[in-house]
């Protein structure tokens, strides 16, 4: 009796652990490629995302099936976010010393990052629903989706803008900072955390612990301020 290769392949691709396997495998391969080449366009998040999408298309798997199979990884997002408090704690003294510069930077840069994206979209004639979806692009996906829904945007579209913003920020952010001669770890971390949220924070942690600590702080505070102030600003202005 000849082996049923098609049945075996179907059983493999529909196994509950298949999604986890390709996700972790794609990310590890992307990390190895980035560490070996240090080429900015081999950003692990971007490469692994494109790899997983390609595998899903080749295997004929729907996003719903993939999402169900990686539910365990989704549950780990919470602990992973909490783990960002470790570099914060290790650099707590340094953060206290720079408390007021941090707050001032957050207010100015956060406002600029929010207004710039929506402003450019408005200049190009984007509809209001598109503007409201793009406005919270510089915070993490859960907060951005919630805020977008509150101010009249599309939550799923906001998540797409968040991912694009994070990947682009992680790719070009460090180069722009070096070009502008910004070498201080705290300044680099704040810039990456404010503009590129979690992806930028991961990139900042590759630079140094201090850079990662300030990126995590900026990402957290940016999320809180955006969730509170952006809906209020939209109500007052519109």
What residue ranges belong to the model's regions?
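Gly/Ser-rich, low-complexity
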Residues: 1-2
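Alpha-helical membrane segments and immediately flanking helix-loop junctions
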Residues: 130-157, 161-165, 183-221
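Juxtamembrane helix-boundary/capping and inter-helix hinge elements in multi-pass membrane proteins
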Residues: 38-39, 61, 89-100, 124-129, ...
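Proline-rich low-complexity regions
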Residues: 44, 87, 135-136, 231
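Internal active-site segments that recognize and position negatively charged phosphoryl groups
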Residues: 91-167
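Helical membrane-embedded segments and adjacent short helical loop/helix-boundary regions
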Residues: 7-23, 27-89, 94-101, 105, ...
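Transmembrane alpha-helical segments of multi-pass membrane transport proteins and ion-pumping complexes
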Residues: 19-32, 49, 53, 57, ...
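Residue-level detector of alpha-helical segments with a strong bias toward transmembrane helices
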Residues: 53, 70, 101, 150, ...
């Amino acid at each position: 009796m000849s082996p049923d290769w098609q049945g075996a392949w179907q059983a493999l691709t529909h196994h509950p652990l298949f999604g986890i396997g390709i996700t972790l495998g794609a990310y590890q391969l992307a990390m190895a490629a980035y560490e070996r080449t240090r080429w900015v366009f081999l950003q692990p998040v971007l490469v692994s995302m494109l790899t997983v999408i390609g595998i899903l298309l080749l295997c004929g798997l729907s996003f719903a099936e993939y999402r169900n199979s990686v539910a365990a990884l989704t549950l780990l997002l919470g602990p992973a976010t909490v783990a960002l408090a470790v570099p914060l704690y290790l650099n707590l003294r340094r953060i206290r010393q720079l408390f007021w510069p941090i707050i001032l930077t957050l207010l100015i840069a956060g406002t600029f990052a929010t207004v710039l994206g929506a402003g450019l979209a408005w200049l190009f004639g984007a509809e209001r629903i598109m503007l409201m979806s793009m406005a919270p692009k510089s915070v993490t996906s859960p907060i951005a989706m919630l805020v977008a829904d509150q101010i009249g945007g599309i939550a799923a579209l906001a998540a797409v803008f968040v991912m694009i913003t994070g990947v682009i920020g992680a790719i070009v952010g460090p180069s722009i900072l070096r070009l502008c001669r910004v070498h201080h770890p705290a300044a680099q971390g704040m810039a990456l955390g404010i503009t590129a949220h979690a992806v930028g924070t991961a990139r900042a942690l590759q630079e140094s612990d201090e850079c990662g600590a300030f990126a995590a702080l900026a990402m957290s505070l940016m999320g809180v301020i955006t969730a509170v102030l952006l809906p209020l600003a939209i109500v007052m202005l519109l």
